[in-house]
Amino acid sequence: MSKRILITGAASGFGKIAAFDLAKKGHKVIATAQVYPQMSDLIREAKEQGIELTVDKLDVTNATDIAYITRKYDIDILISNAGIMEGGPVAEQPLDLIRSMFDVNVFGGLQLAQGFIKKFVDEKRPGKIVFTTSMGELWTVPYVAAYCASKHAMGSIAEGLKTELAPFNIKIATCNPGIFGTGFNDRGVDTISRWYDPETNFTPSSAFDDTAEALANQLDPQSMAECIVDVALDENSNFRNVHPKETEDFVKQLQADAWTAKS
């Protein structure tokens, strides 16, 4: 049965792959992008591939955009995928960058979800919301701690929504990617250079040496996008979905180790 599915952050990465895959499966997909040039690229690529796709503008930090989108579209599934990463040592990271990241990763995603939840409840119909969080929701990665904090927050909100909305037959799930080569992680690391200066900041530049190795071993994003698609369409999916399995096992071990970690 065809579903009406709206995806945020669909201009690239997991959101774009998932949007195209869902459209190929025959679902009515609304792929949203933050700015108009991204929309043009999506429209052109969908046309080139012969894919029927509705493309619209949605900046999740823009209340006018959110009001317009929630008013215009009746959907069955929301895939809340838009997000940004600001990197750097949290003890020195500029607070304005952390706030702007939380605006996108937490408050924007929640405000959009609230708009569609109200429609689901008012119209007395079921719905599903899938939040793309991160493996960083479940543990804290050094030098992207503030980003992980935003994903911790969104994961807690998602878990609260899951319980609170169960009486209304609204399903909630999270998808928690490991390290995939969408360009997202690379851009997040690049943000450090906008403010970090080894001459004035006390964190040594050598602290970031492990980052290059991690970025050199990123996974193919196709499998993660397929995971998001499967979770969105599965009416009985798990709430939390860490992918790949090796990342899930790694995170579980880190969580177990946290109970005996010293200060």
Role assignments for model-derived ranges:
Residues 11-13:
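Conserved glycine-rich cofactor-binding loop
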Residues 81-86:
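Conserved NAD(P)H cofactor-binding loop of Rossmann-fold oxidoreductase domains
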Residues 113, 150-153:
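Active-site helix of classical SDR
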Residues 113-114, 159:
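A short, exposed helix-loop element centered on a Lys and neighboring polar residues
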Residues 134:
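Residue(s) in the substrate-gating loop at a strand-loop-helix junction
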Residues 89-90, 97-100:
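Substrate-binding pocket helix/loop in short-chain dehydrogenase/reductase
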Residues 167-237:
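SDR active-site lid
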